[in-house]
C-alpha cells in the first residue's frame, strides 16, 4: 500500500486560543528538555526497551503515557530520518569519489609523460607539467576528504551517534533568547486511528455553524492529575488547506491525526499531519484541492 503524508498549517490566534498558548509557554522548556534527554538516551542505547523508558518518563516528569509515547516516537522518527539522510549522503560522496578516482587514473600517466618531457627544459612542457601537477595535488586532497567523510558517515551510522545540534552555536553566542526560542519551539501530539477523534491528547471537532474546528487539548505536567475541565485547554481554528479532507478523516477515522504546535517569530501555529492511500490521490486532488 502506497501511503502519502500531508501536512496542513494554520495560525493559532491568541484571542481564540489563549488557554492553549499560555499552556504552551508554560511547559515548552520542560517539554523540550525531556525531548533532548530522550534523544540522547535512544541515540546512546538504540536497543533500549521503549516501554521501560516510557514508564520512567511518566514517573519522573508527571506526563501521560501518550505524551511520553509522542516524544519517543518523534525522536525515533528523527533518528531514522537522519540515518537515511546519511546513507544518501554516502552514496553521493561515493559517486564523487568514483569520478575523481577515474580522472586521476587518466591524469597520472599524463603527468609522468610530461615529467619526462619537462626534463628537456622545454618551457611549454614545463608549464603544462606544473599546472597538471597542481591540479592532481588538489584532486588528491579532495579524494582524501571524501574518503574521510565517507568513513565518518559510516561510523555515525554504525554507532548511532549522529552529529546534530539543537540550535546553532552562532545564534547562541549572538542572542541567548533567540537561541532558546529557535531550539524550544514545538510540542508534538502523535495520534492513532483507534483513538477518539484520531488523537487521544489533541482533538478537533468541526462546528459547521461557525465554520471552525474546536480544539480540546489534554494538559500534562502539574495538570496531569487534575479532574474535569482543569485538565484541558480549549481553542478554535480553521485550516484553509485540506479542510474538507480533515473533516472526512474525523468522520471515517481512516488516518491517524498528528498535531504540532509551533512558535515562530512570537506567533503560534498548528500543523496537522495525516495520511491517505495513494489509490485515493485522484479523488483527493479533485475534491479537496
Placement of each model-derived feature along the sequence:
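Nucleic-acid substrate recognition interfaces
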Residues: 1-289
Amino acid at each position: 500500500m502506497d501511503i502519502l503524508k500531508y501536512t496542513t498549517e494554520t495560525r493559532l490566534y491568541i484571542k481564540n486560543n489563549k488557554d492553549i498558548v499560555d499552556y504552551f509557554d508554560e511547559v515548552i522548556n520542560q517539554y523540550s528538555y525531556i525531548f533532548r534527554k530522550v534523544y540522547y538516551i535512544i541515540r546512546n542505547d538504540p536497543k533500549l526497551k521503549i516501554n521501560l523508558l516510557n514508564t520512567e518518563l511518566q514517573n519522573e516528569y508527571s506526563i501521560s503515557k501518550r505524551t511520553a509515547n509522542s516524544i519517543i516516537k518523534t525522536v525515533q522518527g528523527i533518528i531514522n530520518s537522519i540515518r537515511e539522510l546519511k546513507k544518501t549522503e554516502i552514496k553521493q560522496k561515493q559517486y564523487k569519489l568514483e569520478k575523481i578516482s577515474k580522472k586521476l587514473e587518466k591524469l597520472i600517466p599524463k603527468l609522468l609523460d610530461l615529467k619526462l618531457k619537462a626534463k628537456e627544459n622545454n618551457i611549454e612542457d614545463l608549464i603544462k607539467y606544473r599546472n597538471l601537477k597542481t591540479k592532481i595535488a588538489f584532486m588528491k586532497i579532495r579524494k582524501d576528504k571524501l574518503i574521510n567523510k565517507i568513513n565518518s558517515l559510516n561510523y555515525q551510522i554504525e554507532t548511532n551517534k549522529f552529529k546534530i545540534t539543537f540550535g546553532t552555536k552562532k545564534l547562541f553566542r549572538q542572542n541567548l533568547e533567540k537561541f532558546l526560542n529557535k531550539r524550544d519551539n514545538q510540542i508534538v501530539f502523535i495520534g492513532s486511528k483507534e483513538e477518539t477523534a484520531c488523537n487521544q491528547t489533541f482533538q478537533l471537532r468541526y462546528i459547521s455553524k461557525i465554520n471552525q474546528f474546536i480544539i480540546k487539548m489534554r494538559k500534562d505536567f502539574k495538570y496531569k492529575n487534575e479532574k474535569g475541565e482543569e485538565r484541558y485547554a480549549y481553542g478554535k481554528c480553521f485550516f484553509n488547506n485540506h479542510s474538507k479532507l480533515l473533516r472526512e478523516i474525523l468522520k471515517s477515522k481512516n488516518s491517524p491525526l498528528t498535531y504540532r504546535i509551533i512558535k515562530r517569530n512570537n506567533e503560534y501555529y498548528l500543523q496537522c499531519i495525516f495520511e491517505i492511500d495513494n489509490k485515493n490521490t485522484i479523488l483527493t486532488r479533485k475534491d479537496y484541492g
